[in-house]
A protein has these predicted regions:
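Cys/His-rich metal-chelating microdomains
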Residues: 190
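Short, non-ligating residues that shape and space the ligands of small metal-coordination modules
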Residues: 193-194
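Extended Lys/Arg-rich polyanion-binding regions
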Residues: 1-178, 197-212, 216-219, 224-228, ...
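Short cysteine clusters
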Residues: 178-187
Length: 235
């Protein structure tokens, strides 16, 4: 297509909003911990990330949203690798997370994990992306994905999987250490969130990451060959 543009410096900026879906193509490695209400699964998989921009919002210099404009954009697909965890729905109740806070807890934990991973694996925040959902069609449970933003993967998800225990624990510690009350760009807000950083629950993320650390316990991070030479399965 052809776009006509003009040079201008308006008193507002635009932020896109996008829908993202992740389809699990092949599970490379999975580990299961706990049982019943404390059941947690962590894994590494080949995935297809489908992203489609649906609208954008105009924000004034004060941060106030002026309006939201619908757009008709084609979806984009990325075949890559993702590290993930999914949990039994009862885990939230078991660890004191209210049902209405579950989406925000997952979303905030995802954002914080994306912010922390570069410190562990040496990537940039822009090199990775994520998705959280209270119910994923492939796992059948509440799930958080963090994926490489490059075709066929770049190794960041693999390293995140190998260092999952340290990653989750340090992510929780970073949120707790932040002095804000309800979440800020230093802990759970993301500059590239396609949902406008909504919903987010700082307390829910702390409780969720604490629950994961509790279930995983003193599990050592995986040795490199555990993640790089897995027994694959297909969904």
């Amino acid at each position: 297509g052809i776009a006509c543009v003009t040079s201008d410096v308006p008193p507002w900026t635009t932020y896109s909003r996008a829908n993202t879906q992740i389809h699990v193509e092949r599970i490379r490695e999975e580990r299961h911990f706990g049982s019943g209400a404390s059941s947690v699964t962590i894994g590494l998989a080949d995935v297809t990330v489908v992203r489609q921009v649906k609208e954008y919002e105009r924000k004034a210099e004060t941060g106030e949203v002026i309006d939201v404009v619908d757009v008709d954009m084609p979806p984009t697909e990325l075949y890559t690798q993702a590290v993930y965890y999914h949990v039994d729905p009862l885990l939230f109740h078991h660890f004191g997370i209210a049902e209405q806070d579950v989406p925000g807890a997952l979303h905030a934990a995802e954002h914080a994990a994306i912010g922390m991973l570069p410190l562990l694996v040496g990537c940039d925040r822009a090199d990775i992306g994520g998705l959280s959902t209270p119910l994923h069609e492939d796992t059948g449970e509440a799930t958080v994905f963090v994926y490489d933003g490059y075709q066929s993967g770049a190794g960041y998800a693999q390293r995140g999987y190998r260092e999952m225990t340290t990653w989750l624990r340090t992510t929780r510690d970073a949120i707790v250490a932040c002095s804000c009350e309800d979440g800020c760009p230093s802990c759970i807000q993301s500059p590239k969130c396609g949902n406008g950083n909504r919903p987010l629950s700082k307390s829910g993320a702390v409780a969720l990451l604490g629950a994961l650390s509790s279930v995983l316990g003193d599990m050592p991070d995986a040795a490199p060959d555990q993640a790089l030479n897995p027994t694959p399965s297909v969904r």
